[in-house]
Curated annotation (Swiss-Prot):
It comes from Ruegeria pomeroyi (strain ATCC 700808 / DSM 15171 / DSS-3). This is Small ribosomal subunit protein uS7. SUPFAM superfamilies: Ribosomal protein S7 (SSF47973). CDD domains: uS7_Bacteria. One of the primary rRNA binding proteins, it binds directly to 16S rRNA where it nucleates assembly of the head domain of the 30S subunit. Is located at the subunit interface close to the decoding center, probably blocks exit of the E-site tRNA. PANTHER family: RIBOSOMAL PROTEIN S7. InterPro entries: Ribosomal_uS7, Ribosomal_uS7_bac/org-type, Ribosomal_uS7_CS, Ribosomal_uS7_dom, Ribosomal_uS7_dom_sf. The keyword Nucleus does not apply. Keywords: Ribonucleoprotein, Ribosomal protein, RNA-binding, rRNA-binding, tRNA-binding. GO terms for molecular function: rRNA binding; structural constituent of ribosome; tRNA binding. Belongs to the universal ribosomal protein uS7 family. One of its GO terms (cellular component) is small ribosomal subunit. Part of the 30S ribosomal subunit. Contacts proteins S9 and S11.
Length: 156
């Protein structure tokens, strides 16, 4: 690791339609090849689909879905005397959010619907109901941490 000071965290600007910084981070993660307008269109159209489906504010649904995906613990590899242990550690709040965003996008991309808007809307609706691939990823992460609880004294 570098011995210099850590890079400063840059603040993102809130998105144009809802004024939400987390949503901007989500769009930035969704964006491919710097095409932000495409990412925005996908998110806003997916939000319209969600709103039509369950008649709730889409930003609320988005945040509830993210809360259902955020992991509280994860495992990290630690070498101790020639053996590698999976040590459960608590996840920092910023990383929780980043992981939830990444997992939600990955799960949406792997779905079978035709357009990304449909896939994202479907994954958001599933996540709100604690179903779907992204929520399963979180459950698997928690199970791994639970299974390796015996090694938690190797925490650093």
């Amino acid at each position: 690791m570098s011995r210099r000071h850590a890079a400063e965290k840059r603040e993102v600007l809130p998105d144009a339609k809802f004024g939400d910084k987390v949503l901007t981070k989500f769009m930035n993660n969704l964006m491919i090849d710097g095409k932000k307008s495409v990412a925005e269109r996908i998110v806003y159209n997916a939000f319209d689909r969600v709103e039509n489906k369950i008649k709730r504010a889409p930003v609320e649904v988005f945040h509830e879905a993210l809360d259902n995906i955020k992991p509280s613990v994860e495992v990290r590899s630690r070498r101790v005397g020639g053996a590698t242990y999976q040590v459960p550690v608590e996840v920092r709040p910023e990383r929780r959010e980043a992981l939830a965003i990444r997992w939600l996008i990955a799960a949406a991309r792997n779905r079978n619907e035709n357009t990304m808007e449909e896939r994202l809307a479907g994954e958001l609706l599933d996540a709100v109901q604690s179903r779907g691939t992204a929520v399963k990823k979180r459950e698997d992460t928690h199970k791994m941490a639970e299974a390796n609880k015996a090694f938690s004294h190797y925490r650093w």
